[in-house]
A protein has these predicted regions:
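Amphipathic alpha-helical segments used for helix-helix packing
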Residues: 56, 96-117, 166-174
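Hydrophobic alpha-helical connector segments
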Residues: 69-103, 149-156
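Helix-turn-helix
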Residues: 12, 16, 20-54, 58-59
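Conserved hydrophobic residue
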Residues: 26-27, 114, 143
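Amphipathic alpha-helical packing segments from all-alpha helical-bundle domains
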Residues: 65-73, 114-140, 151, 185
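N-terminal intrinsically disordered/low-complexity leader segments
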Residues: 1-8
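C-terminal peripheral helix-coil segments that are non-catalytic and often amphipathic
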Residues: 93, 97, 127-140, 158-200
Protein backbone atom coordinates (compact mmCIF):
# COMPACT_ATOMS: atom_id res chain seq x y z
CA UNK A 1 0.00 0.00 0.00
CA UNK A 2 2.83 2.39 0.84
CA UNK A 3 4.39 2.06 -2.62
CA UNK A 4 1.03 2.54 -4.36
CA UNK A 5 -0.01 5.54 -2.32
CA UNK A 6 2.88 6.96 -0.28
CA UNK A 7 1.08 10.21 0.49
CA UNK A 8 -1.83 8.33 2.05
CA UNK A 9 0.63 6.30 4.10
CA UNK A 10 2.39 9.46 5.28
CA UNK A 11 -0.95 11.01 6.18
CA UNK A 12 -1.92 8.01 8.32
CA UNK A 13 1.45 8.04 10.07
CA UNK A 14 1.21 11.78 10.76
CA UNK A 15 -2.34 11.49 12.09
CA UNK A 16 -1.40 8.61 14.38
CA UNK A 17 1.76 10.40 15.51
CA UNK A 18 -0.18 13.56 16.33
CA UNK A 19 -2.45 11.57 18.64
CA UNK A 20 0.47 9.74 20.26
CA UNK A 21 2.68 12.80 20.74
CA UNK A 22 -0.13 14.99 22.05
CA UNK A 23 -1.13 12.34 24.59
CA UNK A 24 2.32 11.20 25.76
CA UNK A 25 4.87 13.80 24.72
CA UNK A 26 8.04 13.30 22.73
CA UNK A 27 9.81 10.99 25.18
CA UNK A 28 6.69 9.01 26.03
CA UNK A 29 5.51 8.43 22.46
CA UNK A 30 6.23 4.97 21.08
CA UNK A 31 7.06 4.25 17.46
CA UNK A 32 5.39 0.83 17.71
CA UNK A 33 2.15 2.43 18.88
CA UNK A 34 2.23 4.99 16.08
CA UNK A 35 2.85 2.31 13.46
CA UNK A 36 0.08 0.09 14.83
CA UNK A 37 -2.40 2.96 14.88
CA UNK A 38 -1.45 3.94 11.32
CA UNK A 39 -1.63 0.29 10.23
CA UNK A 40 1.86 0.37 8.72
CA UNK A 41 5.14 -1.40 9.36
CA UNK A 42 7.25 0.81 11.59
CA UNK A 43 10.02 0.64 9.00
CA UNK A 44 7.87 2.91 6.86
CA UNK A 45 7.95 5.53 9.60
CA UNK A 46 11.74 5.53 9.55
CA UNK A 47 11.76 5.46 5.75
CA UNK A 48 9.62 8.59 5.43
CA UNK A 49 10.67 10.57 8.50
CA UNK A 50 14.06 9.23 9.58
CA UNK A 51 13.38 9.07 13.31
CA UNK A 52 10.82 9.78 15.99
CA UNK A 53 12.24 13.27 16.37
CA UNK A 54 12.04 13.75 12.61
CA UNK A 55 8.38 12.77 12.72
CA UNK A 56 7.67 15.26 15.50
CA UNK A 57 9.45 17.98 13.53
CA UNK A 58 7.43 17.20 10.42
CA UNK A 59 4.15 17.47 12.31
CA UNK A 60 5.09 20.90 13.61
CA UNK A 61 6.40 21.96 10.20
CA UNK A 62 3.13 21.06 8.49
CA UNK A 63 1.04 22.78 11.14
CA UNK A 64 3.17 25.89 10.79
CA UNK A 65 2.67 25.81 7.03
CA UNK A 66 -1.09 25.71 7.57
CA UNK A 67 -0.93 28.71 9.89
CA UNK A 68 1.33 30.63 7.53
CA UNK A 69 -1.16 30.05 4.73
CA UNK A 70 -3.97 31.25 6.99
CA UNK A 71 -1.96 34.35 7.88
CA UNK A 72 -1.44 35.29 4.24
CA UNK A 73 -5.05 34.54 3.30
CA UNK A 74 -6.08 36.91 6.10
CA UNK A 75 -3.90 39.65 4.67
CA UNK A 76 -0.67 39.00 6.51
CA UNK A 77 1.61 41.26 4.52
CA UNK A 78 2.90 44.70 5.32
CA UNK A 79 0.26 47.24 4.42
CA UNK A 80 -2.63 44.81 4.77
CA UNK A 81 -2.24 43.87 8.40
CA UNK A 82 -5.69 45.05 9.50
CA UNK A 83 -7.09 41.73 8.31
CA UNK A 84 -4.69 39.86 10.58
CA UNK A 85 -5.61 42.00 13.56
CA UNK A 86 -9.29 41.34 12.89
CA UNK A 87 -8.60 37.60 12.67
CA UNK A 88 -7.83 37.42 16.40
CA UNK A 89 -11.25 35.92 17.34
CA UNK A 90 -10.86 33.41 14.51
CA UNK A 91 -7.56 32.31 15.99
CA UNK A 92 -9.29 31.54 19.29
CA UNK A 93 -11.74 29.29 17.47
CA UNK A 94 -8.98 27.60 15.48
CA UNK A 95 -6.95 26.88 18.62
CA UNK A 96 -9.99 25.45 20.42
CA UNK A 97 -10.67 23.19 17.44
CA UNK A 98 -7.08 21.94 17.41
CA UNK A 99 -6.34 21.04 21.03
CA UNK A 100 -3.85 18.34 19.98
CA UNK A 101 -1.59 20.94 18.37
CA UNK A 102 -1.63 23.07 21.51
CA UNK A 103 -0.64 20.02 23.53
CA UNK A 104 2.25 19.44 21.13
CA UNK A 105 3.51 22.95 21.83
CA UNK A 106 3.26 22.30 25.56
CA UNK A 107 5.19 19.04 25.30
CA UNK A 108 7.81 20.79 23.19
CA UNK A 109 8.19 23.44 25.89
CA UNK A 110 8.54 20.80 28.61
CA UNK A 111 10.88 18.40 26.82
CA UNK A 112 13.15 20.41 24.52
CA UNK A 113 15.75 23.14 24.86
CA UNK A 114 14.04 26.55 24.48
CA UNK A 115 17.24 27.80 22.86
CA UNK A 116 16.82 25.21 20.10
CA UNK A 117 13.12 24.96 19.21
CA UNK A 118 11.94 22.62 16.48
CA UNK A 119 12.05 24.19 13.00
CA UNK A 120 13.44 27.36 14.55
CA UNK A 121 14.28 29.20 11.32
CA UNK A 122 10.86 28.67 9.76
CA UNK A 123 9.01 29.62 12.91
CA UNK A 124 11.20 32.65 13.52
CA UNK A 125 10.38 33.89 10.01
CA UNK A 126 6.67 33.36 10.72
CA UNK A 127 6.77 35.48 13.87
CA UNK A 128 8.97 38.05 12.17
CA UNK A 129 6.24 38.42 9.55
CA UNK A 130 3.66 38.99 12.28
CA UNK A 131 5.92 41.55 13.94
CA UNK A 132 6.39 43.36 10.63
CA UNK A 133 2.61 43.48 10.25
CA UNK A 134 2.29 45.11 13.67
CA UNK A 135 4.93 47.68 12.76
CA UNK A 136 3.10 48.44 9.53
CA UNK A 137 -0.10 48.91 11.53
CA UNK A 138 1.76 51.25 13.86
CA UNK A 139 3.08 53.26 10.91
CA UNK A 140 -0.48 53.50 9.62
CA UNK A 141 -1.70 54.73 13.00
CA UNK A 142 -3.90 51.71 13.71
CA UNK A 143 -1.84 50.41 16.65
CA UNK A 144 -0.28 52.80 19.19
CA UNK A 145 3.41 53.32 18.40
CA UNK A 146 4.30 53.28 22.10
CA UNK A 147 3.98 49.48 22.21
CA UNK A 148 6.93 47.25 21.33
CA UNK A 149 5.91 45.29 18.23
CA UNK A 150 7.51 42.02 19.31
CA UNK A 151 5.85 42.23 22.74
CA UNK A 152 2.54 42.89 21.00
CA UNK A 153 2.87 39.71 18.96
CA UNK A 154 3.98 37.68 21.99
CA UNK A 155 1.05 39.01 24.00
CA UNK A 156 -1.38 38.01 21.25
CA UNK A 157 0.04 34.49 21.25
CA UNK A 158 -0.30 34.25 25.02
CA UNK A 159 -3.82 35.65 25.02
CA UNK A 160 -4.94 33.10 22.44
CA UNK A 161 -3.07 30.03 23.72
CA UNK A 162 -3.16 30.76 27.45
CA UNK A 163 -6.54 29.20 28.26
CA UNK A 164 -5.68 26.04 26.31
CA UNK A 165 -2.30 25.71 28.01
CA UNK A 166 -3.85 26.21 31.46
CA UNK A 167 -7.27 24.53 31.19
CA UNK A 168 -7.51 23.95 34.94
CA UNK A 169 -7.06 27.68 35.67
CA UNK A 170 -9.51 28.54 32.90
CA UNK A 171 -12.11 26.26 34.48
CA UNK A 172 -11.50 27.66 37.97
CA UNK A 173 -11.82 31.26 36.80
CA UNK A 174 -14.70 30.94 34.33
CA UNK A 175 -16.40 27.67 35.24
CA UNK A 176 -15.85 26.46 31.67
CA UNK A 177 -13.19 24.39 29.93
CA UNK A 178 -11.43 26.20 27.06
CA UNK A 179 -12.92 23.95 24.37
CA UNK A 180 -16.50 24.65 25.51
CA UNK A 181 -18.28 26.53 22.68
CA UNK A 182 -19.64 29.01 25.21
CA UNK A 183 -16.14 29.82 26.45
CA UNK A 184 -14.78 30.09 22.90
CA UNK A 185 -17.52 32.55 21.94
CA UNK A 186 -17.02 34.70 25.03
CA UNK A 187 -13.23 34.62 24.69
CA UNK A 188 -13.32 35.56 21.01
CA UNK A 189 -15.68 38.45 21.73
CA UNK A 190 -13.51 39.63 24.64
CA UNK A 191 -10.30 39.61 22.61
CA UNK A 192 -11.96 41.37 19.71
CA UNK A 193 -13.18 44.12 22.03
CA UNK A 194 -9.83 44.35 23.82
CA UNK A 195 -7.96 44.72 20.57
CA UNK A 196 -10.38 47.38 19.36
CA UNK A 197 -9.85 49.36 22.57
CA UNK A 198 -6.07 49.16 22.30
CA UNK A 199 -6.05 50.20 18.66
CA UNK A 200 -6.16 53.89 17.85
Amino acid sequence: MATRDPEATKARILAAALREFSAKGIAGARVDAIAASAKVNKRMLYYYFGSKDGLFQEILRRRLHERTAALHSAGGTAGSGAAVRQAMPERVTRVADDAEYTRLLLWEALETDPQQPVNAAIRRDFFRTLTDVVRAEQDAGRIPAEFDAAQWVLSEVCLVLGPMLLPQITQLVTGLVPTDPEFVAVRADFLGRLEARLAT
